[in-house]
Curated annotation (Swiss-Prot):
Family, similarity comment: Belongs to the phosphohexose mutase family.
GO biological process, one term: carbohydrate metabolic process
Keyword Cytoplasm set for record: no
Key words of the record: Isomerase, Magnesium, Metal-binding, Phosphoprotein
Upper taxonomic lineage: Bacteria, Bacillati, Bacillota, Bacilli, Lactobacillales
Annotated Gene Ontology cellular component terms: cytosol
E.C. designation(s): 5.4.2.10
PTM comment, free text: Activated by phosphorylation.
Pfam family, one: PGM_PMM_III
Residues bearing PTM Phosphoserine: S103
The protein's name: Phosphoglucosamine mutase
Amino acid sequence: MLKYFGTDGVRGVANAGLTPEMAFKLGRDGGYVLTKDKKDGERAKVLVSRDTRISGQMLEYALISGLLSVGIEVLEVGVITTPGLSYLVRAQGADAGVQISASHNPVEDNGIKFFGSDGLKLSDAKEEEIEKLIDAPEDKLPRPSAEGLGTVTNYHEGASKYLQFIENTLPEELSGIKVVVDGANGAASALISRLFADMGVDFTTIATHPDGLNINDHVGATHTKKLQEEVVKQGAQLGLAFDGDADRCIAVDENGNEVDGDHIMYVIGSYLADHGRLKKDTIVTTVMSNLGFTKALERRGLKNIRTQVGDRYVSEEMRANGYNLGGEQSGHVIISDYHNTGDGMLTGLHLLYVMKDTGKSLSELLSDFKEYPQRLINVPVENKKDWKEHKRITEAIEKVEKELSDEGRIFVRPSGTQSLLRVMTEAPTQELADKYCEEVAKVVEEEMGSN
């Protein structure tokens, strides 16, 4: 288990757990690890970007200082989505990229996420190498002076290049369907109107006026109530919600019902399969995907492969075995024919394209998807790493597993980014899912609760 890196980089409360001093060390040590193999005389190039949090610039300047101190040339992208940065790293032939964002987390939090030259998140081994340098008793990294120091170049035009990339993944404009888009007051806020207008979409927006403090504030992919209300109020056929860094997309159908990542993958995957484009007739998801998703795919003759939680592991499975669609229930969807990471705006537009090309509403496209009732409880804990050592917890889980048999499941895991233990159940009825989830969550709270 890594000390600083979670499933989505290094996160913490800005200026408390994640300080400018830490950002400087991450820039210096991370930059060195990712560029140390450059040939003598070759300058390493790293792209840096952020979301709209008030703490973003504070951490950005500290991080960039660290990168400059080991002689790295920095391209400062400004505010852009995480998948936007990932794309630009590859498009620019950069050695690495760093996004400053805490995704769907509240404004108090922030994070620092590294990408390699391939635009992908780092391996555990690379992150461990960075952590060893952070904790080293003495800083022995190079300290160039004068012409050996790095410089910063403004690269705000990168946003336009990224939007052009997304537009080129679709064969035609997307007029004829009314859409409401929720930008979460995050990184996609300034991009949505440009992209959707260019694609000919009939759209309105909410939560696209960030002020540094309102990111994810009761809006976005994890708070869809306002979007659901707007879709019904405006008589729209589709709602699309992104999170703070727009690496995920949650939809809303024409009746105001939330449509999560499982449902989105089912719609896009079914369309690809119908056109002979779903590789190996398989969709890759994590263990958190609903049982109903797997059963719906089976009825269509399609397969579902599951990985541990984290879109990084979905991506690794897809690349290792040649699959082209995967993601998470939370809305990270990877369509690898176009992009190697979850991209909320790309996903949303391709979902819209399926609706237009089939002439069907979102609810019609999902008519064969029967979801198992599910319950998720996040339990704040003191130490999320040692939960398996608590006998009462493991016994409670075993009891539920025995009673549910193959008609449901229980899944317990630590959050990759917060001090939480997540307890999730699925069962034939909501009553049973609630009952079993509450039973186990109560034991977890009694054994490990932080309150």
